Amino acid sequence: MSLDVKGLSLSIGSSRILSDVSLNVKDGERVGLVGSSGSGKSMLLRAAIGLVPSNCKITGSCHVGNAQIVGANDSALARIRGKYVGVVFQQADRALNPIMSVSEQIALPLRLHYNLDENDIQNRVKVMLEKVGLGANILNKRTFELSGGQMQRVGIATALITCPKLILADEPTTALDSVTQKDVVNMLTSLVDDMGASMLFVTHDFSVLSRAATRCYVLDSGRLVDSARVGELLENPKVRSTKQLVLAARALSLSKNDLSLSSKNDLSLSSKNDLSHSNKNNSSKDDCIFKAKNIHVVLGSSKTRVEALKGVDFNLRVGESLALIGGSGSGKTTLIRSLLGLQEISEGRIEYCGKVVETAKNAKKSSLKDSAYVNMRKQCSLVFQHPFAALDPRWTVRKSVSEPLEIWRKNMSSDSNTVDSHVIDSKVDDVLNLVGLNPNVFGKRYPCELSGGQAQCVAIARALINNPRVLVADEPMSAIDVAERTRILDAFNVIRANRPNMACVFVSHDLGMIQHLASSVVVLKDGVVVESGNVSQILTNPKHSYTRELIDAATL
């Protein structure tokens, strides 16, 4: 089924989101739509199926097959959505219903559009689960029991269960590790081709786009500025915004021939601030901030028992920049949550600055009154993986960013609350500017008014505002386009250069980012450390087959 958009313009109040956009996707064609965060990609995709805010003004035309979407009523749109058009949304954890089982979720479009008996529905669900690489053992699970990769596969299965003729995929691999990204894209494109369907694939990642589409459009500030075959855009970009995206993608990709940044791009991220090479740790072996010994973590009940960590040893020294890498479900997030006292450990012990903050024996009793624990929580900041889940939807950006300072306000040196407020406002302005957000523009906004990349920038700003001794970032750039990543990497590296004693832990599946941020790396697989060492040595000469698999999947 074809998609034909002509002269589409969309505005909300005085803000113009899309301006005179025209594009087409032919029958059986896979087309990409690429652009930086906030360029209007997701809004264009939503406009293609009538999922736009009620207060928006939209002009132009959008045809799905012979059906006109612009101006169509709700009943007409309901007949098209889910049956003829399937949508894979950006964040599966937000798109899926948390109170529905996987089976109920995938079966819902069938129940809405077809009159089938229950056995037929369940058989189709099982067949679709098998096609997306999932087993029948997850049929009765809820979304919160699934990994990110599993949730995204369930989202794809839900979108494809009715065999629609047009697939709209909005950043379907965001926040997935490189191996899972490759598998999901290959699986999605294979299913689309087998069904003879068309697909519009929205992304900011050229390494993903090269696998998902044959040609693409480039969107910049709500306008289409370029279009060509994907290979042509990668090899010879002509438009400025396309060049920036391609250069940024190459700068942050892995190269088997040359892992140094300076020879790969001319962007602002320079080798003098590339702390993966400059921050060699001169601390003594005993100068550790965190020491974790023989950490075991068991999740779930007796029936669903999962050993998330299996005897992990972990040291973090003063000034060290360390990366934890691994696929979805490898235990990366569980490890950092254990370090920060957010996850009970089943065995082992954790020390912070030489003092025990958690053991298996005291894990179940409150440590809030323990001075060592309180000291650790004051001096450590965490950037969560999902910014929308971490930000209070009722709070403005300014209030969210200032929250850590408000909590520890009594430690700030000032003579009055008025001075305190001025100091806090000044610090909020500083960190928002640091992550590339104008405080005058974004300070009064709410999370629902932010793009995915902008929300992640707010989360990073909030983590930095307290000048932490330890910064722990859990997939800090999973929702940010490649152009923004270079600016954020610059910000991280400038901060590290000015505060050489601050230790950082970067949890990521993005090996291109890790090579510029970390001096050492730990590779986790199924809760076990399979390889560790100097980041350049690991990336250029990996010993373990799993490490090689991660690197191969991340190479552009």
Give the positions of each predicted feature.
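Conserved ABC transporter NBD signature motif
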Residues: 57-69, 348-362, 376
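Helix-to-loop junction immediately C-terminal to a conserved catalytic motif
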Residues: 49, 340
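ABC ATPase NBD coupling module
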Residues: 69-86, 104, 112, 233-237, ...
